[in-house]
Amino acid sequence: MPHLRHEKRCPAPVAGVDEAGRGPLAGPVVAAAVILPLRGVPRGIDDSKKLPAAERARLCGLLHRRARVGIGIVEADEIDRLNIYWATMKAMTLAVEALGESPAHVLVDGNRLPRWGHPATAIVGGDALSLSIAAASVVAKHTRDTIMLAHAAAHPQYDWHANKGYAAPAHLRALTEHGPSPLHRRSFAPVARAGERFADVLMRSGHTASG
């Protein structure tokens, strides 16, 4: 279970930072920054991947009420322009800036740090080790899932309500059948390939219709 040992080694306030959505073919990458309260930390915080959706939603609500939370969102078109690595770094930077308070130290999940002026420590597997990072993982994951569920209503053919933009079989089939949407990351190889195939199908069908 994540703990506060890393936080206690750092000057306060300490923010934990994590992201959700580096791997999907569609939708934004979302980062969250969380400064936990001195008292009243919600119980049950863990790596978001270990929690069911309902528990993530419950904890996210509690964290927004009890902790200081910042969220950074970088959309698909900017991911294509920057690449996913730099888009993730930007989302993390935006999340810390959105805290409304400058942390004395930042704990970041992973092995890379954004180019910012904050004293920071990267912790591999930090969402399973640091309570602040775990809290950020919950907020980032729930926030991104909520965004993708809203997009799913407008684009039901891609099955985003189930796959949240990841490369599930139904999503890949829909990409081939319908082509990419404006929310797809066209710099990602499966999306680029599907776009080329779809354009080819349209071209052939157009020639058939005109012939």
Summary of predicted features, one role per range:
Residues 1-211:
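RNase H-like, Mg2+-dependent phosphodiesterase core
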